[in-house]
């Protein structure tokens, strides 16, 4: 695609809303609260914020700067940074290709639950076998996934300004208002258990926020750092081509550093509010042992919590799943856009052709994922010890292998091959100040690659702490 014809976000607000929409996804809602509750509440939040300002800032800045400098999507951008590294673009582009089918499948699950709360099926949705019965059915999951994919495809088909930007500007403020509203309500509830124990939302807030360092070992602290880094890494949409694609649509006169700071604040605030919304509510009705992660939290634990609230729980549940739908679709739009922009730039296709090709691929991929829970069901032991089906295998490959690998290689490319000045010059091209320049240089050259390598080792089931302990025995 000709660079002169390339679409643009209209300004800073459009870019920030779109990038924040990508970053604020299911990971913020179903993983952040669980990790915060598991990892001593305030300890996890403190570590997460520190990493967001250092590690996350470095990776986010790198991806966005590469995109704006080259004015290309992920498939071709890295080759323009350094000819011998164009293969890295292909590696980065594979990530959204793997993610899109299973993300839209999960989006279909969210739509199913939202529909249940609007059609009077709230009692049924709390049943122990409801979720399993739905995902193992041969037709319903496909129908809901297709609806979700269609909505995603329409937004991407409409383009950057009239599609992605316009959509994000409308949905993101609504999403934030819903999260704030539900969070406030979560703090007001209380419940008396069968044993007479009274738990309140404020008690849950204390569990969420107050750090407890008592009895924490080096291993415990290390695992909190790994959990926080893993969550942040997946949350800000780096190393998967998305921020490179979005960066390529940013006008040259936009203050990149200011925009990146706003994206950081937005994503961290929403992640924090997600915890504020979920942890107190689950604690009130189920205690700390009621917290789980992933689909178990969203589709099993939370419906039971909403049901325990009584009639008001139906309203809260409906609002919650509307909010989750918005979060899921803004993220799926960004995943599809990373694929589409790559096709447009590499093969000089029109947006419409690229969007149609990507949608057709996603339909085939979704069928494979959905059938993985029934006619093609299997259980595979992963290197990290988890038992996986098709969706889990795709998630493991994209999130645990390819993304850390792409991020490590990006750090090597910028930190050692073309030097950090490449990114710094792009960020400061209009005379803007690079507020954390020295930090960025140290992080991209040394700290980030080491942390990412540890994250990658953990994905292969390698216990770094135990490994170091054995060395010094």
Please provide the spans of the model-predicted regions.
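Loop-to-transmembrane helix boundary motifs in multi-pass membrane proteins
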Residues: 8, 14-15, 22, 138-143, ...
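Membrane-water interface regions at transmembrane-helix termini and the short interhelical loops
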Residues: 35, 39, 65, 80-81, ...
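Membrane-interface "cap" regions at the ends of multi-pass membrane proteins
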Residues: 1-30, 59-64, 68-80, 86-87, ...
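Select transmembrane alpha-helical segments in multipass membrane proteins
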Residues: 8-19, 45-47, 84-97, 143-148, ...
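Inter-helical loop and helix-membrane interface segments of multi-pass membrane transporters/permeases
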Residues: 3-6, 34-39, 72-91, 104-163, ...
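Transmembrane helix-boundary motif of multi-pass solute transporters/channels
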Residues: 11-49, 241-242, 258-261, 265-268
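Membrane-embedded translocation segments of transport machinery
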Residues: 2-9, 169-329, 333, 353-354, ...
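C-terminal membrane-solvent junction of multi-pass transporters and transport-like membrane proteins
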Residues: 88-91, 137, 347-359, 395-452
